[in-house]
Amino acid sequence: MEVTTDKNQPSRKSPIDTAVVLLMIGATLLIVWLSFSNRTFWGAHWPGYGDMVSLLPEPSAWLRWVLGDISEVAFYKHEFASIGLLAGAYLAYWANRTGKSWQGFAISYGTGLWPWLVTSSLLGLLLSNLLWGWTVTATTWQPTFVAFVSLPAAMVLMFGGGWKVTINGALMGAVFVTPMCLLIVNYVCQPLALPAVIGNVLGMAIASVLAFLFCRYWPNLVKSSSSQTPPASIAPAKAPDYGVIWSLRRILADFSEAPFFGNELASLGLILGALLAYSLNPSSPAYGSGLLLHIIGAQALASAIGVLIWRQQWMLRGWYPTYIPLVSVVPAAILAYGGSWQIIVSSALLGA
């Protein structure tokens, strides 16, 4: 995997470009196949969430489950949202690499490590489902998505790119993070009737701390003999003015912050994919709850309140975790208590 930022070689194709084109073709073929293979099981324009889990462990259902894991951190759990997220993220990476003015916030914080980051996250997700997918049944949800939004990406950002960090991060995500979340969700959250998101967040935090301690004592897991310097962005970003336009962009970027993308184009792809899924079948995204629009609205409100309240922290630190309510208390509250305006407003306020 080679990342280049050389503006003098516009005609040279990166392996990333070829891989993304192949992935997009594969995703299109997958959608066509799923459409025809599931036609006898659904009456709407796309099979619902219940149709998917009822067909487990059939291959078509497993493909939908694994793809849905990519967007599950936002509680959308749908293949269209996941494909939209990845497509938007790649567009943002390409725009950053070629110095486009419309790139938005530099993806993955301007490190240039997005190809390694997303590769490690996807490998960790695949390994997690291979190792722990047997725990998922038609009636039992399990947090197989957690490796995509935790340790693998964090290790790439911490230790840099390269296959050693990418593969070891993916392995640790599948071996440390996913089982820790499974234990806490099934043996703590469920007996105490607590939301699963508590177990997910706690499990990711504990496992990540253990993994980083592991790397401290065995540094060869993440250090290469020839150090790789991550490629920089084409040009340094101008200092933001933290005005209205910046705030609107920040609200949108918060939707893709959890997988360490933090970019408006990635967020736009995520949301548009989820809305497409909802338009085809309201019972398909968001676990078939029909509450996708309520969740998106509440997430936007929570981010807006957070950006407004914590604007000074953004100005002082350059980054602040205003995205956290979007992937925790806000969607969890709506799924648990419904989509009334009281729940939307109160969860957004308390979350922010």
Annotated model-derived regions:
Residues 8-21, 155-237, 247-257, 352:
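Membrane-interface helix-loop-helix junctions at boundaries between adjacent transmembrane segments
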Residues 104, 108, 144, 149, ...:
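Residue-level signal for well-ordered alpha-helical segments
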Residues 113-121, 125, 142-148, 165-174, ...:
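Alpha-helical transmembrane segments of multi-pass membrane proteins, especially transporters
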Residues 2-134, 241-313:
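N-terminal signal-anchor module of multipass membrane proteins
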Residues 127-128, 147-159, 327-337:
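Membrane-helix boundary/interface segments in integral membrane proteins
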Residues 38-42, 137-139, 216-226, 316:
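Juxtamembrane/interface segments at transmembrane-helix termini
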Residues 112-113, 133-140, 156-170, 308-321, ...:
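Membrane-helix interface "capping/anchor" motifs
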